[in-house]
Structure formats: structure tokens, C-alpha cells
Amino acid sequence: MDPRPVRTLSLCTGIGGLDLGTDLALGGRCRPIALVEREAFAAAHLASAMEAGIMAPAPIHADLATFPAQSLAGSVDLILGGYPCQPFSQIGFRHGTHDPRHLWPHILRILRTTNAPLAFFENVRGHLTLGFDQVLADLADLGFDAEWTVLPASAVGATHRRDRLFILAYRPSQLTTLGDTLLPRLEGLTRHGDHPPFGQEPSGPPAPPSLPLFPPAPLNHDGWDRWLRLHPDTQPSIRRGPYGIPDRVDRLRALGNAVVPLQAAVAFRTLTTRALGATP
């Protein structure tokens, strides 16, 4: 029997990088119940992605502070959240909990109200030295354990570094029973990355093919020449855009706040494997 769909609630969604990555890690089984995103440009991009079939359709709410989480109590398997990094980043002056963009208390309220067993968050590396201890304490108060890691986008082949902190929060009493649902095996691999025993058929979603996932570095002219010959129609869904484009600033801000989907997928698989291994 195929694992059941995973019902997700996405907070501070941005342009959906964390959502796409988690869906990739779970074999395309994420079923969003709702998304919360206040930026009009990002919300419009999400709606466009839904219309194009890139993301599953779901209502998009604009205000995290007034989101009616009580209506979803007991109906959410996994909460996703890329809560604002500016309170913890150097470029945002690291005002921490005093920053008006500090939205963690609202996410904590939603986590408590929905009683979701699992959450996956993303933030900047600087969060480790500002505010992270409070996040862990708040999660512990709700009965969560946590695993975390810092993973650069370059680790999955991107041409930029972009270190990101990924946090997996889980209720130990529930994670074991959800293990087969939340960590499906890739075809040909066991949960720990080994091949299955001789004579045993592989199961689960197919493993991703060995294909180039990113274009060459900006100054790799020979690489770009080969890439464009092989992929003449390649266009990213959101591009920086030249000067003179009215929404150029919105695009840059959206990209600056985004996470590479494959980066999120690798982090989710890594942390879930680690959590399951630590669960008695």
C-alpha cells in the first residue's frame, strides 16, 4: 500500500522553495491545506505556480497574526515555515525579538493550536547565535525534540553558497509510527542509503535521475555554451529581470528570501533520518 498523503500547512511561504523541496523529499505526496504569505508579489507567484500545476492548489492567507489555526486542529501532519530571517541576519541588523518582523510567536501559537506532530523550518545561519535557544526552549515546552543542520545551496550543486539553517521539530511519541509515511524509501535504496538485500525488489518512489540540476557558474562561458545547446528552452520560473522591469525589486527580494528546493529536500531527508535513528 502506498504511504498516505502528508497534509501540510505552510507559513511565511515566500515563493515556495521550502514547500517544493519537502514535496520532493516525500515523493510528491504533500497536500497543502493552506499557505500564509503577506507579500503580494510572492502570493501572486504562488497562485501562478498553482495554476501551472507546479504546486498543489490551496488557499493563500495574508496575515499570520490572524490566521484561524483553530479550524485546522488535528488536521495537519507537517507545518512548514521560513519565518523572517531579518531579525537574525547581519543585513537585517540582528535586532532579534525586538524586530517587528519577528514572527516566531505567531508560528508557535499555530503549532500549539493545530497540534501538528512535525514541523520543518528554515532560517539564516546567524539564527544559531541569536534567538535559536529560545526557539528550542519554546519547542521543548510543547513536547518537541529537534534536529538541525546548516546546509549551503552549493552542497546540492547551486552556483552560490547561501548557507541555511534547517530545523526539524518532532514529537518523539508520534514520529516512530509516522516513519514509513514521512521517510519513504527511494527506489533501489534502503532508508540508510544502502542497496536492498540480494533478491529483494526495491520499493517506494523512484530515485531522482543523475541529471545536471543547475546551470554553470556565471563566468563559465564554455559551460554555458554547452548548457544552452542541450537546454535551449531553459528558463527559471523567476528571473532577476533587467533594469526597467517594474517588478524587478520584488523579484530580487523574493529570490533573496528564497531557499533552493533541492537544498531543502536534502536537509529534510537528512534530519528525518537522524530523528528516526534517535527515536527508541
Predicted feature descriptions by range:
Residues 20-24, 48, 109-112, 137, ...:
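Short, well-ordered alpha-helices that flank and scaffold nucleotide-derived cofactor binding pockets
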Residues 6-65:
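SAM cofactor-binding core of SAM-dependent methyltransferases
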Residues 1-6, 73-74:
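Short helix-loop-beta connector
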